[in-house]
Design a protein with these regions (language model features):
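Internal, well-ordered alpha-helical segments in soluble enzyme and binding-protein domains
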Residues: 3, 21, 74-80
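ATP-dependent carboxylate-amine ligase
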Residues: 30-33, 60-61, 70-73, 79-247
């Protein structure tokens, strides 16, 4: 709430209308104009797939966004950007066109290469919610029949502590196969992933080092697969090592 209080009455607060916690914060006191996005009753909302959707302003369709980014989280980011731009005088159709020309940043579903029909991506996702939104976005883009292989390392401090390990099966629901790099962990990753089934031929596997991890993925991958490597670090150069192994 301190952050809300620092915004002057002449300012604008752009808030995710889907988050009840934010609504509670604003309810404790707000002296600025608020623009909401995301929910159907918000000032700015979306109808359609995250890669191609109509933008509604106060319930009326005013523009359409077609871009390369996937996932509901990116759709919400787009609405937030449109709302902020609208506040400073940018017409919504102009903002939507700018998003159509937007080139995504590095390490956000960045395609590192394709070999033998197998695509390898790099993504910065490093906690369960980020893993889930990344994989959900790819699943929505590819459809139900494509195979997604999630390769990840719990590298952030909270993940190393195991504070969110119970959420990993939920985070990986949209992955056909999951491979976890376990170096440096003080908790049992195989136990945390047990609901998925762990071991050779199962839905999930664990690896104590990068060499083992690359070998596991190489043996499992097939033409047409999409491999998503997720970490907030360098991940031992696993992306390039996978591309070499798969070639």
């Amino acid at each position: 709430h301190h952050l809300v209080r620092t915004v002057p009455p002449s300012g604008r607060i752009v808030v995710n209308g889907l988050e009840e916690s934010l609504a509670r914060v604003l309810h404790t006191g707000c002296w600025s104009t608020v623009s909401s996005f995301g929910a159907a009753v918000s000032d700015f909302s979306a109808v359609g797939d995250p890669q191609a959707f109509d933008v509604l302003h106060q319930g009326a369709a005013v523009a359409r966004v077609q871009w390369s980014l996937t996932g509901v989280h990116n759709q919400l980011n787009a609405l937030a950007a449109i709302a902020a731009a609208h506040h400073v005088g940018v017409p919504v159709p102009q903002a939507a066109q700018a998003l159509a020309n937007f080139q995504n940043v590095k390490r956000r579903m960045e395609l590192r290469g394709t070999v033998n029909g197998i695509a390898v991506y790099d993504d910065f996702a490093h906690h369960p919610t980020a893993l889930r939104t990344t994989l959900d976005g790819l699943r929505r883009s590819l459809g139900a029949d494509a195979r997604i292989l999630a390769v990840f390392e719990p590298r952030s401090n909270t993940m190393k502590l195991g504070a969110m390990k119970s959420q990993l099966p939920w985070a990986l629901e949209n992955a056909d196969l999951a491979f976890c790099h376990t170096a440096g962990l003080d908790w049992d990753a195989a136990d945390a992933l047990a609901p998925l089934g762990v071991g050779p031929g199962q839905r999930a596997q664990t690896a104590p080092d990068i060499d083992t991890l690359v070998s596991q993925v190489q043996q499992a991958a097939k033409p047409g697969d999409h491999i998503v490597c997720m970490s907030n670090g360098g991940f031992g150069g696993v992306h390039d090592r996978l591309l070499r192994a798969l070639s």
